[in-house]
Regions:
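Nucleotide-activated sugar donor-binding and catalytic core shared by glycosyltransferases
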Residues: 1-147, 157-277
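Short beta-strand segments
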Residues: 149-153
Length: 277
């Protein structure tokens, strides 16, 4: 496709010694075919390599292509054993974005419900569950007048649906995603989905969080595993069917949780392994 052509043209013009590919098994294969002398580092999720909930043949396909890399860096909430198909293999904690590394959280009465995770090219079930989380937070805000409930929408259509609802005065609707460092710095509580990157950032910063497990059955299993693997007191799971009263009680409880030991990011280990390649 056009993007593939563009990438290969950039490689020919720039002639790099090393290329880092975030997943994308077919791109790894294509680069190794067309540019065999260039070293390739694959950044992977633990579930990309070991996932008993996925089809075995699909996992064999993905691992066959991922293992063409000169170095596979598997970063996430859990560590996994080396797969013998890989040349060089490193399993580390999640690599944290540079803009998050320097954030210092000073808790306030601000609660942030971050409706991220993408709303483009996703199923209706995902959109519906996203709206349901936002609507729940709108209802809960009236039960928690001492807090300000920020609801951060990842798209205009989600914002439009929520904006039609009546909300208490302590609700602030954001019609687009705001920089994470902007709300991480003063959040007393974050309400989010159970994705690897967001949970890892919250664990690194020590911010209390309520994480919703939602979406298709495959995603629910993956998100539940993320919570279980993390296993820290500052982050708990919730389901979409929780009542507003129970959710308000949970919010108040989590606002009182003390910070634990931060989860160390895998950034330094990843950089060292690449430099030694």
């Amino acid at each position: 496709n056009k993007m593939g052509i563009y990438i290969h043209n950039c490689i020919r013009e720039f002639t790099p010694d090393l290329i880092v590919v975030d997943g994308e098994p077919l791109m790894i294969k294509s680069i190794k075919i067309s540019h065999p002398s260039i070293k390739v580092v694959a950044l992977l999720n633990p579930a990309d390599v070991v996932n008993p909930n996925n089809n075995k043949e699909a996992m064999d396909f993905f691992n066959e292509f991922y293992s063409l890399s000169d170095l596979a860096i598997v970063h996430g909430i859990r560590r996994i054993d080396k797969d013998s198909r890989y040349t060089k293999f490193l399993s580390i904690n999640t690599i944290i974005r540079s803009e998050i590394i320097g954030v210092e959280n000073v808790p306030t009465n601000n609660i942030y419900c971050v409706l991220g995770g993408g709303t483009v090219n996703v199923g209706q079930l995902f959109v519906d569950s996203t709206i349901a989380i936002g609507q729940l937070c709108q209802k809960v805000a009236s039960l928690l007048p001492q807090y300000t409930m920020h609801i951060v929408c990842s798209s205009q259509n989600i914002f439009n649906v929520l904006n039609r609802n009546s909300s208490s005065e302590n609700v602030v609707l954001h019609d687009e995603i705001i920089p994470a460092e902007q709300y991480y710095c003063n959040a007393g509580l974050v309400i989010t989905r159970s994705g690897r990157n967001t949970l890892s950032e919250l664990a690194y910063l020590g911010i209390p969080a309520i994480s919703f497990v939602s979406g298709c059955s495959y995603r629910k299993i993956e998100q539940t595993n993320n919570i279980n693997d993390l296993n820290i007191s500052t982050i708990v799971a919730a389901n979409n069917d929780i009542s507003p009263v129970a959710f308000a009680d949970l919010c108040q409880k989590m606002m009182q949780v003390k910070k634990g030991e931060p989860m160390l990011p895998g950034n330094d280990e990843a950089i060292k392994s690449i430099l030694h390649l």
